[in-house]
Amino acid sequence: MVSCGNHSEEKNTSTEIEEVKPQKEFPVLDSSRYNVGFLIMDGVFNTELTAPFDIFQHTIFRKNIKAMNVFTVANTDDYITSFEGMKIIPDYNYLSDSIPKIDILVVPSAEHHLDSDLEDEAMLSFIKKTDRDAQFVTSHCDGAFVLAKAGLLNESVSTTFPSDINTMRTMFPTLDIRKEVLFVHDGKYITSAGGAKSFEAALYLCEFLYGKEIAQELAGGLVIDWNLNEIPHTIIEKK
C-alpha cells in the first residue's frame, strides 16, 4: 500500500542579519573660518599632530579673527594608530570622500616618512593636489621629507628634525635645508624641527595671520611662554 501524503518543504526559519554600517558623519565646518587639514597615517607621532592641532583649534575662542576649522584626513575610514599607540578615527578619507577645500595643510611626522611613506603615490598625489589651492602647507619634524618628495620644496628653504638634516640633504641634494633653527617660513611653506617645538611653528603662523597679541593669548591658554624674537627661526623674504 502506497500512501501519498502532502510533503511540504521545511521553511528556513533562520534569519540572516546583515551588518549595517552607520552612516559616516563629517565635521560641521564654519564657512567663515580657515579649513585646516591634518594628514595622518599609522605611525604618526603624537606631539607633531596634537601640538599644532591644539593651537589652531583654540583660535575659535579668540574674538574678531578668522578662526580655524581643524580636521584630520587619512587614506582609510578605520582608525589609525599613532606611533605611541593612540587610536584616531580620521574625519575624511582622501581616497573616497569629497574633501573640503583645505586652506592650511599640516603634515605631522610619521614613523615611515623616511622610507615606505615616500613611495605612497596616492598620498603624494593628494598633497600635490591640496597644495595647488592651499594658502599654507606646513610640516613638523620628518613631514618635510614628504613635502620634499612631492616636489613642494624645490624652490623653498626648509628644515626638519635636527638629527635628520644630513639624511634629508643626502636624499634631496638640491634643496636648501637649514640647521640650528626651529622653523623656516618660505612663501607658503613652513617647515619645523618638530617635537615640542611644533607648538612654536604653529604659534608663529597664528602671529603671522592674527598678530602678536592673539598669538600670545593662544600661547597663554596652553601655558606657553611665547616671544618670536627668542625663537631661532628663518623667514625668507620674497622679492
Features from the language model and the residues they span:
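Short acidic alpha-helix initiation/capping motifs at coil-to-helix transition points
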Residues: G194-S198
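A conserved active-site-flanking secondary-structure segment within enzyme catalytic domains
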Residues: N154-E180
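Extended, subdomain-level signal for the structured scaffold at the beginning of enzyme domains
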Residues: C4-V137, F145-A148, N166, K179, ...
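A short beta-strand/loop micro-motif in the catalytic core of glycosyltransferases
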Residues: V137-T138, S158
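Conserved Rossmann-fold dehydrogenase catalytic segment
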Residues: R178-A193, V223-N227
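Residues that mark the start of a beta-strand
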Residues: R33-N35, V157, K188
